[in-house]
Structures are given as C-alpha cells and as structure tokens.
Amino acid sequence: MLIIVESPTKARKIQSILGVKTLSTIGHFKDLPDSQIGVDLQTYEPTFVYHEKKQHLPEELRKAAKGETVMLAGDPDREGYAISCHIYEEVKSVAKACLRMEIFEVTEKGLKESMTKAVPFEQTNAGLYHAFLGRRIGDRLVGYILSPIASRSLRNKYSVGRVQSPAVRLVVDREREIRNFTASLYWLLNIQLTKDGTSFLAYHVKGKFEAQADAAALISRIASETHATARKVEKKETRQAAKPPFTTVDLQAAAAARLKFTPELTMKLAQGLFDHGLITYHRTDSVRMDEAFIAEIRTFLAQSVGAAYLPAKPNQHKSKNSQAEAHEGIRPTHMHATAECAERIAREQLTPEHVRLYELIFLRAVASQMAPARYDSTLLLFDVAGESFKATGRVLKFDGFLKVYAEGEEDKEKDKDGKGSEEKLQTLPALTVGEQVVKERESLEEKKTKPPGRFT
C-alpha cells in the first residue's frame, strides 16, 4: 500500500502511525503555465504543466505506485481533491488500484476510519475538480487579461484578481462611506437612583433625543422631584448557552479578536496543528462533534470541574449548512489536562503561536459541552413626574461554560440603544411595585452617531 498526501509533515506523521509508506507532493505539482494564458478562450479548456522544480515528481510517484493499492489522500477540500486528481492521472496506469482517502484527523483512530471508508477514485465526486477548475481558470482569465489593461490605463503596474479586485471595491466603497459620513448629535436622558447604598442608572424609555431642547425640557420637568416610583418589577433567570466548536470563519474571528492573529496566520498555524495530528481538519462549516469525543470531554469535565458543569445530556450543536454535517467542527484530537496544551505542542517542535491557537481551540471545544451560564436578570420601570425610565441589570448566578471559555469581544452583541454594556451589567436592588427610591440627580449624555466600521 502507498499513501500520497500534500504535506511532508503529514506524510511523516502518517507513516509513523500506520507504518505504511507515505509520500507527499508538497502541494500542487501541476498548474497553468506562467509564460502564457494556458486556457483555450473558445472552449475554456486548461493546459496544465508541471512545476519547474517538480518535473521529477510524476516519475517518482509512478515508480512508487507500481503494483500498489494507492490511497490518494489530499486534503478533504477542493484543492486537495484537485491534487489527488492530478496524482490519479499519473499513477492509474501502473497502480493496482487507486482509492480516495479523506483524512479529517491524523490519529491512529482517524486514519484507520479513513482507510475503511476509502472508495475507488473513479466513484468520487468529480464536481470538486470542476469547482477547482472554475476557480483556477477564473483566476487566470481575470488576472491575465485585465492586469495589463489596468496597468496601461493607470500608468503603473497593477494586478487585477478574481477575488482581490471585488474585495478592494468593497473596501473602497466602505471607506468612502466613512469619509463622507457626517456625525449628528443626540442625547440620552438618565437619572441616578439609590436604595440601601446601591446606586444605579435608569434611562428615559424614549431612548435617543435628537433635539437637545426636548431633553432639556424634560430635565426641567423632573429636576424638582426627589424620588422615583417603581411601576414595574420584572425578574427572571436567563441563560447563555455554550457556543459550538469552531468553524473556520469563527476560528479566524476569535483568533483575530483574542490573539491578534491575521486570518492568514491563523490558517497557517491551524494547518501545522492538523498536519501534526493535534486538531481535526480546519477548513469546515460544521459544528458537529464525534460522539465518542463528546463522551471524553464529559468525563474530563466531571473529573476537573465537577458534575454541576455538565448538562444532563450532551449539547447538540447544529450546523447552518446541513451538507456540512458529514464533517466535524474544529477540535483537538485527544483529551488531556488543560495544563498539558503547551507540552503537547512542544513535543511536536511547534511554536508559541501554535500553543496559543491550540489552547483556544481546546478550550472552545471543551466549553461547547458545558452547562449554560445563568443570570438573574431584572427590568425596572420608574415614574418620575409622569415620565418613564427603565433600568436593566444582570447578575451572574452560575458561570457554567464561562468558567472555561470567557466571553470575548467577538461574542458580544452591541447595544441597540447606544447605552453600552454598563447598564446591562449593573447590579440592581430588590424592589417592589409602588416603592419609592431616592433620585440623586438627572443628566444628559451627549452622543454622536458613528460611521460604519471598517471591515475586519
């Protein structure tokens, strides 16, 4: 048997686990030529050539594949399938059989499962290769034809791309919106109330006042009042559910917000973690997790943080894309003590950046199977001289999954009324309907509307 993958690191890891000869192509070994367009403009048929530094590779692959059952194990995505297609064309005439093997985790269990599910390459989904062709041919046509035109027109060397040019247009349009934006003032009217030593803010139910005079008139109206009367007291327990394991997009967002990693760096580090058998495949829209691994997480949680943090049944997270359910979300391949994260990365001779990303993935996966956080949420409505004011508060009652994976900037929803998170999280005193509380002061907060934000 012979296994062929893209990455030399992954090849070494697989061979060490299975004891099966494993070769790598080091990515694509065929592409469109650099010196010409490489696409028939009548039929859109591409002409692929060997990379200059990989001219020897096809012969090496044929020699190794002769008489062998060949597992074509490029990554389980469009690019990986395309590489497998190109390998197949080279070795099909000499190999005993060619099978497509999709690897989602580089572990003994994961590799053996992938081998048992391998299918004859002729029976695989050629649509993935057509998707690759559409992308690659589109890249070449747009770039090769339009870049010279743009360079001549703009009198400088410019590159036009299928993706980069529309992306630049979106960025430019947003920047124009920002530069052309004219801020307008608005005001928020609040009162400071006090009971039993607890001071808190209540805001006028109207929210924004676009005319300062209107807000000032209300200030004058309530200024002489010394108390506010509680008209409504509503208390309830609210729950914040644990978030699912990472998808690719969620991982990039969290790594940018928490670790200050660019999306490119995040994917490079994740590729290294995957190739070394530390995480499952990192290009995924799925949030599903293997049931056996969920059981491992639950055992780990029971031993490390206690049964109170375990829901009665495992959390079932649903992917937005039903087709993604065949795969898993991004998770570690092995459960272990949290303190061992750095040690495991060190054994693979990876970097501190790999450690930080791995810890993020590890903690998110663990937290996804924890009990929800519970809050005591309170809504109070007050009357002051016939005007209504609202105070909301939330007190953490049980931290649940937050014990392991605290809420980050990428998780927080912005306040719709512009009052900020302070009001939401303030502590409110116990009150009954009809009770009066002391009004310490009233004030206007001057605010400005904000332009749309830049893309992140």
PLM-predicted stretches and their roles:
Residues K96-C98, F121-G127, L146-R152, R176-F181, ...:
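Active-site phosphate-binding and catalytic loops of NTP-dependent enzymes
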